[in-house]
Amino acid sequence: MRPDCTDFRQLFLDDVPMMDMRAPVEFAKGAFPGVVNLPLMNDQERQKVGTCYKQQGQAAAIALGHQLVSGTTKQARLEAWAAFAKAHPDGYLYCFRGGLRSQIVQGWLRDEAGIQYPRVKGGYKAMRTFLLETTQQAVEQCDFVLVGGLTGTGKTDVLHQLDNVLDLEGHANHRGSSFGKRATAQPAQIDFENQLAIDVLKKRARGIGQFVLEDEGRIVGSCTVPLELYQGMQHYPLVWLEDSFTNRVERILRDYVVNLSAEFKAVHGEEDGPRLFAERMLQSMANIYKRLGGERHQRLSEMLREALQEQQRSGAVDLHRGWIEGLLNEYYDPMYAYQRAAKAERIEFAGDAVEVREYLKARALREPRK
């Protein structure tokens, strides 16, 4: 039999298959990419056992657990665990602390299905701690540089051409702006942190010691950048991306209208997709009402509404340029100009997409890798 595992680094580097014995409510709060939730107890059973433990102690709680997970319920779950184990002979199982739940499942698999299947010692909690420490160590030991620029300059496009990027918006499934929500939901905060840490781990294992980040706020949609990383972002050097106003408008039109509306159709269907896209865009505009002021918000909202109606009627997106131009001129550009002035001392290079990309590639080569 393979031994139980304590090599968390290799588990994540190799994307080792794992099944999670925790209840669905625990899994939903935070898990690891690619892991399958095959719980020993469902949420209701876990709650009953927890109440019993508080009132009558461990022995009574264990007895109740065995009573709740018995007969056909136990058999169905055992079959699911056995199927996973057979499909993934190199995998592992775990529970919250690597204790009773995973040991019970291990025992049932061994005694009733004839399968010897190892567990992760320390369970979810130990692996989660390892990933938190991974991010912390990278902040302490690695070199970081930020890419900033006005809205629509294509910062994400440039980042995706680099092999040493940490894509905060990608991990958060959000574009980072008031209009940044995607057609699919954002991950739970813990999932966001875990995905980011695994990304760091894999890149450092490839010898990367310098990371490029987009210059973000602390909050990316509903996801919060880890505090130690965000604190570092307040003083990391900055590379400023520049592009013409016309190009920026066209890029925003592509990303936030053409591509996003197509994404809504793909996710929600031809009928509901356009309606939900329009609702999302109008809500995004409503979210910045206070920052725009009443008159400006009303004017830009009306332009957006007319553009959405024309898009739904004919498929044409030309009218969207009007509110995009207005929002850039009257809101985003003045805000970014103020932010750039505040960060001027940290800007070490400025240029267009090609120049910035080449600068960052050259910069990565001349910096020591850790």
Swiss-Prot record:
It catalyses: 5-methylaminomethyl-2-thiouridine(34) in tRNA + selenophosphate + (2E)-geranyl diphosphate + H2O + H(+) = 5-methylaminomethyl-2-selenouridine(34) in tRNA + (2E)-thiogeraniol + phosphate + diphosphate; 5-methylaminomethyl-2-thiouridine(34) in tRNA + (2E)-geranyl diphosphate = 5-methylaminomethyl-S-(2E)-geranyl-thiouridine(34) in tRNA + diphosphate; 5-methylaminomethyl-S-(2E)-geranyl-thiouridine(34) in tRNA + selenophosphate + H(+) = 5-methylaminomethyl-2-(Se-phospho)selenouridine(34) in tRNA + (2E)-thiogeraniol; 5-methylaminomethyl-2-(Se-phospho)selenouridine(34) in tRNA + H2O = 5-methylaminomethyl-2-selenouridine(34) in tRNA + phosphate. One of its GO terms (molecular function) is transferase activity, transferring alkyl or aryl (other than methyl) groups. Coiled coil: none annotated. Involved in the post-transcriptional modification of the uridine at the wobble position (U34) of tRNA(Lys), tRNA(Glu) and tRNA(Gln). Catalyzes the conversion of 2-thiouridine (S2U-RNA) to 2-selenouridine (Se2U-RNA). Acts in a two-step process involving geranylation of 2-thiouridine (S2U) to S-geranyl-2-thiouridine (geS2U) and subsequent selenation of the latter derivative to 2-selenouridine (Se2U) in the tRNA chain. InterPro entries: Rhodanese-like_dom (IPR001763), Rhodanese-like_dom_sf (IPR036873), SelU (IPR017582). Its EC number is 2.9.1.3. The active site is at C95. This is tRNA 2-selenouridine synthase. The lineage of its organism: Bacteria, Pseudomonadati, Pseudomonadota, Gammaproteobacteria, Pseudomonadales. Monomer. One of its GO terms (biological process) is tRNA wobble uridine modification. Keywords: Selenium, Transferase. It is an enzyme of class 2 (transferase).
